[in-house]
Amino acid sequence: MSTVQVPKLNTKDLLTLEELTKEEIISLIEFAIYLKKNKQEPLLQGKILGLIFDKHSTRTRVSFEAGMVQLGGHGMFLSGKEMQMGRGETVSDTAKVLSQYIDGIMIRTFSHADVEELAKESSIPVINGLTDDHHPCQALADLMTIYEETNTFKGIKLAYVGDGNNVCHSLLLASAKVGMHMTVATPVGYEPNEEIVKKALAIAKETGAEIEVLHDPELAVNEADFIYTDVWMSMGQEGEEEKYSLFQPYQINNELVKHAKQTYRFLHCLPAHREEEVTGKIIDGPQSIVFEQAGNRLHAQKALLVSLFKNVEEPS
């Protein structure tokens, strides 16, 4: 560990990327790149991370469990439905009890307010593994992926096309924080949350970022360095079939990407529905880096875990 220092974060928890400064984000990314090259660093020897899941997961569960093992600790899976919290115990009581047993909590659930309460009532770090409003760990991995490709955020344009969902929200805050240009194109009625857009615009004024929310996908991807999409229907929305016709013009396909830079890279948080939000030719093509992006979830989260756990041990 002589080459890279553990980032000092001015927060106990990570609930949204709004809580981190640009400098903290960059230091986390650089630390994640170090950990990617040095997988077996036992920096969390004997530490236990509780993993609370109310939503199905592949990448989040496996990357957090594998990350804790590689760091010398242990990830403990806790099904939200099987815990007493799922049978009426308050979030506050759950937070206080878990703080007696384990060293940190990662929670993947529906209500962002529940995660905020869990963090407020816990004496240990709480990480938002996804809520209906935010997906900060994904955005951190996305920034890492972009940084590995470009070694900068200055002058980089990220175009997000599709549903203005939790992933979009976290990317807006992330782009604003690091001073990147981000355009969002959604159908009318599916724009990102207005309050989150306002927050991103306010941050952008301080960092020099550009944030645009549009309805024209061609305009959004014009001269883009990175094109990003997500599924049109998030978990719990599967009955909204009428969305398909509205979203069809927002599919990432050969026609749409002609408007981006020739050297563009394609991003997707996965799971993907081929021939819906993206064609197979794009996601499986040479300019797609979605699996490198998925791999970076592991490394970005390891950097975050070490930083948050060390902050508890050595408070500033």
From Swiss-Prot:
It is an enzyme of class 2 (transferase). It is found in: Cytoplasm. L-ornithine binds at N166, D230, S234, M235. GO terms for cellular component: cytoplasm. Disulfide bonds: none annotated. One of its GO terms (biological process) is arginine biosynthetic process via ornithine. Carbamoyl phosphate binds at S57, T58, R59, T60, Q84, R108, H135, P136, C137, Q138, C269, L270, R297. It catalyses: carbamoyl phosphate + L-ornithine = L-citrulline + phosphate + H(+). Pathway: Amino-acid biosynthesis; L-arginine biosynthesis; L-arginine from L-ornithine and carbamoyl phosphate: step 1/3. Reversibly catalyzes the transfer of the carbamoyl group from carbamoyl phosphate (CP) to the N(epsilon) atom of ornithine (ORN) to produce L-citrulline. Belongs to the aspartate/ornithine carbamoyltransferase superfamily. OTCase family. This is Ornithine carbamoyltransferase. It comes from Bacillus cereus (strain ATCC 14579 / DSM 31 / CCUG 7414 / JCM 2152 / NBRC 15305 / NCIMB 9373 / NCTC 2599 / NRRL B-3711). The gene is argF.
